[in-house]
UniProtKB/Swiss-Prot annotation:
Keywords: ATP synthesis, Cell inner membrane, Cell membrane, CF(1), Hydrogen ion transport, Ion transport, Membrane, Transport. NCBIfam families: ATP_synt_delta (TIGR01145). This is ATP synthase subunit delta. F(1)F(0) ATP synthase produces ATP from ADP in the presence of a proton or sodium gradient. F-type ATPases consist of two structural domains, F(1) containing the extramembraneous catalytic core and F(0) containing the membrane proton channel, linked together by a central stalk and a peripheral stalk. During catalysis, ATP synthesis in the catalytic domain of F(1) is coupled via a rotary mechanism of the central stalk subunits to proton translocation. GO terms for molecular function: proton-transporting ATP synthase activity, rotational mechanism. It is a peripheral membrane protein.
Length: 179
């Protein structure tokens, strides 16, 4: 997953740059939801991986997704994804782009996973730490429970993951011992 996020980052940044420069017909969240949904289709994947298909045919397929943006720029973006064989990362591109849009709007979505449910005091402490970390942004806090963490927290937002769990520390220790 980290590899796809690494691949996706420059494309998400390009979309965000396009969004900032365009006065109208700018890419939005819906564009980044529709494209991965289309690519998730088995027939679309077969078409996109078919070596007999030309890049122009693949771009034509993907540009069939209705979007209210500058069509020429959208097709150029799709052609870049196809030419560089980055179309499998569209879901990650969409996620990173949506995160960048929320940050530009002053909002950061954070998923906090813990081994057991956090009590009100712990939630408040984590919330304040996150607000300090993301100063100037409104932090939207979601919580999940994963007993496999044993203890501690894993904090995830966009392409940033902070693993302060017991499981993460044990895995790090195991990697160190193997080295």
């Amino acid at each position: 997953m980290a590899d796809l996020i690494t691949v996706a980052r420059p494309y998400a940044e390009a979309l965000m740059g396009w969004r900032k420069r365009a006065a109208r017909n700018r890419p939005g969240r819906m564009h980044c939801r529709r494209l991965p949904a289309m690519i998730a289709d088995v027939q679309a994947q077969a078409f996109l991986t078919d070596p007999e298909r030309r890049d122009a045919e693949k771009v034509s397929l993907l540009s069939a997704v209705p979007v209210a943006v500058d069509v020429k720029a959208w097709k150029a973006f799709l052609a870049l994804l196809i030419h560089n064989d980055r179309w499998p990362a569209t879901a990650e591109i969409g996620t990173l782009f949506a995160d960048a849009m929320r940050r530009a709007e002053g909002v950061v979505d954070v998923l906090v996973t813990s081994a057991i449910a956090l009590d009100a005091g712990q939630k408040t402490a984590v919330q304040s730490a996150l607000e300090r970390r993301f100063a100037g942004h409104k932090v939207r806090f979601r919580e999940a429970v994963d007993a496999a963490l044993i203890g501690g927290l894993v904090i995830h937002t966009g392409d940033l993951t902070i693993d302060a769990s017991v499981r993460g520390q044990v895995q790090q220790l195991a990697r160190t011992l193997r080295s």
